Amino acid sequence: EELYEAGKIKAIGVSNFLPHHLDTLAKTAKIMPMVNQVFLAPGELQTTVVEYAKKHDMILEAYSPLGTGKIFDVPEMKQIAEAHDKTIAQVALRWSLQHEFLPLPKSVTPSRIKENTELFDFELTEEEMKQIDQLDGVVGKAKDPDTTQF
């Protein structure tokens, strides 16, 4: 908070905070975090975290937006990608953006890095978004920060 107030940092962020963690933080914080970095990917839409973030104008930074690679084995994602002449990765990243998440895909391959930026010449339909939202569990589940040793 001191660094933020002094203008030395532009934002305050947390990682893997659930709503009850943020509520606890709110009791003592002068400035609430602007960003919460959490595992968000097609198949893992952490609804309570998403709703809390929207209610409190908090940006959700989606780490592992490609479901640690598991998303490439999901037939529904392949079907949607083919319908748009896009890759599964592009569809997953577009899904993130349309949910107003900030996706952080990891790649060291120049062609994939470029491909990951080619997301603004198409949109997923409302029906496609719902279809992807309902892919519960296909990429695994986010670790519970209350019980996981990080």
Per-region residue spans from a language model:
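Beta/alpha (TIM)-barrel catalytic core signal, keyed to glycine-rich beta->alpha loops juxtaposed to Asp/Glu
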Residues: E1-A142, D146-F150
